[in-house]
């Protein structure tokens, strides 16, 4: 199955070993220098979020501008999609996250049921492993086909009740592998049993018509983003404030 068909059907697709070891290692060194256990976390302590480089010297161009990734995104979302999220998961967790969805369906669930489908993705997340990742150090756990499920209950934070979780898949993959997922697909972060932080880059992309208010800030990056493969309307390229 080709990547786009798999993303539509399964809710995610995988591109193994897409990003070079050099890029992964350089970014890991940057993140190690900036990691601390007081960082914010999602759902469960240890599932931290850490800032990615905002200055041109350390900016991971191979990840953010990767041609293969953006060929897929452009075919799904057209030429005017934009990057609304630029962050990294730093996992030292001793507990799993709850299964959750990062966003709900665009229309009310009753409307989606009557229509027969929630429609194609309007937001897509691209995750990149910076190291070999498996059950020992917190591989992402996905619920295949869950992005089209409309018969479930969740709380206001997107947690899915356990009784609705069926078959799952652990994304056990080598360094530099990329997971492209419909933002509605259910998933969770898992325990990292090792004593080294597991990093997973997360860049989020949205259809042009679904405009979010948050702006991404960079410093001295005009040349870096010149002719980038997505719309830069929401990027402040000479402002490194967080």
Tell me the role of every PLM-derived stretch.
Residues 185-242:
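Non-heme Fe(II)/2-oxoglutarate
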Residues 1-9, 15-117:
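Non-heme Fe(II)-dependent double-stranded beta-helix
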Residues 20-21, 88-93, 104, 133-135, ...:
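Short, solvent-exposed loop/turn segments at secondary-structure junctions
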Residues 95-172, 211-216:
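Catalytic core of non-heme Fe(II) oxygenases with the double-stranded beta-helix
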Residues 86-88, 126-128, 201-205:
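A structural signal for short, well-ordered beta-strand segments
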Residues 44-47, 142-155, 193-204:
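C-terminal/domain-terminus segments
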Residues 14, 179-180, 202:
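Hydrophobic beta-strand signal
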Residues 173-187:
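Conserved metal-binding segment of the jelly-roll/cupin
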